[in-house]
UniProtKB/Swiss-Prot annotation:
NCBIfam families: transcriptional regulator NrdR. Keywords: ATP-binding, DNA-binding, Metal-binding, Nucleotide-binding, Repressor, Transcription, Transcription regulation, Zinc, Zinc-finger. Coiled coil: none annotated. Transmembrane segments: none annotated. It comes from Bacillus cereus (strain ATCC 14579 / DSM 31 / CCUG 7414 / JCM 2152 / NBRC 15305 / NCIMB 9373 / NCTC 2599 / NRRL B-3711). Pfam families: ATP-cone (PF03477), Zn_ribbon_NrdR (PF22811). GO terms for molecular function: ATP binding; double-stranded DNA binding; zinc ion binding. This is Transcriptional repressor NrdR.
Length: 153
């Protein structure tokens, strides 16, 4: 590993520990030449996950897009950024655990909505209204009735 301070190639590992639920390793290193200390992260390179959009176009999965949508849905709601990041990680993990290389955007939206339903009902309705593109007020009211029904159970 090349030292970021002096570019010397010789470094030694002082400490290693798993992070990110065991998916990465954090290493504390020291340069053998200038004794500068720095941190590196090592993780398995995952194969790209491709999202198939409604129009049939394809793009690489981007968890930041999910996070932005969640932040928008949770505006002025008592939901922390940490919770939203956990939802984003959970969604990505669930998709990767499917073991497929392509996933439809509809499936991603449904998974996000299920996660959001457990966190905040108002944010769930906001997200659902954009994601499902309710055609009229009656469809929106039916969704609200479903939420109320599930709360009673």
């Amino acid at each position: 590993m090349r030292c970021p301070s002096c570019s010397h190639n010789g470094t030694r590992v002082l400490d290693s520990r798993p992070v990110d639920e065991g998916r990465s390793i954090r290493r504390r290193r020291e340069c053998e030449s200038c004794l500068s200390r720095f941190t590196t992260f090592e993780r398995v390179e995952e194969s790209p996950l491709i999202v198939v959009k409604k129009e049939g176009t394809r793009e690489e999965f981007n968890k930041e897009k999910i996070l932005r949508g969640l932040i928008k849905a949770c505006e002025k709601r008592p939901v922390s950024l940490r919770q939203l990041e956990e939802v984003t990680q959970s969604v990505e993990r669930e998709l990767r655990n499917l073991g497929i290389s392509e996933v439809k955007s509809d499936m991603i939206g449904e998974i996000v909505m299920e996660e959001l339903r457990d966190i905040d009902d108002v944010a769930y309705v906001r997200f659902a209204s954009v994601y499902r593109q309710f055609k009229d007020l009656n469809v929106f009211i039916e969704e609200l009735k479903d939420i109320l029904q599930k709360e009673r159970e």
